[in-house]
Amino acid sequence: MIIDSHIHLNDEELFPRIEEIIDRAKERGVKAFICVGYDRESSELALDIATMYEEVFAAIGIHPSEAKHYKPTDIEWLEANLSHHKVKAIGEIGLDYYWEKTHEAKQKELFIKQIELANKTKLPIIVHMRDATNDTYEILKNHKDKNLSGVMHCYSGSWEYVKNFTDLNLYISLAGPVTFKNAHSPKEIARKIDLSKLLIETDAPYLAPVPHRGKTNESKNLKYIVKEIASLRGVEIETIEDATYKNTVKLFNLGEL
């Protein structure tokens, strides 16, 4: 059994086909899905989907790309809905200097506000980080409660920084890029990381793994990510499935599935 720890079933590419996507994934051993929001509208839909489907859980939050035009009422809505029993995390939140370099201050402000909500509610955080490794680390180190957990989603940083994040009680999640031929950093991390700190995800509809690279991604493709990690480590596929399943259940407090 495996869990897709990060998927956008609320995306326009997937939502119209949501039942067949869930069914195909379940046929391939996917037991549960964390449907992740990135603004208020997508977070509302993530929560609606989680309410409709027993095997789907929601993460709600505001992505750094929304920092320049989010409203205070969005944060108020977020806080008001964090107690819903199907909400399992705040995310995705973080910093992205690749697309949004000109709004660093607003991104940091939004990131810190949502970390503070996580500290208050004890919900784990799902962190988006792109071209912002040092600033992301410094904010987490200085603003996240020591015992608050979370995950570095679709981790794109270096192996050298992995210990910095895991020392902050954060997991590292690998996605489709670990299967890409020249993705040296994800492959190095897959080989070296302590399995007790590893999660897997599709980030669908994005980042489809080989052999479906460039196509619309979905949870049924999680098996290719598991297979690649197992191959890189020289272990059985079941070893990766069992470890990441247990880690995901623990992080998101999913209980018995």
Residue ranges and their predicted role:
Residues 1-257:
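Mid-domain alpha/beta scaffold segments of enzyme catalytic cores
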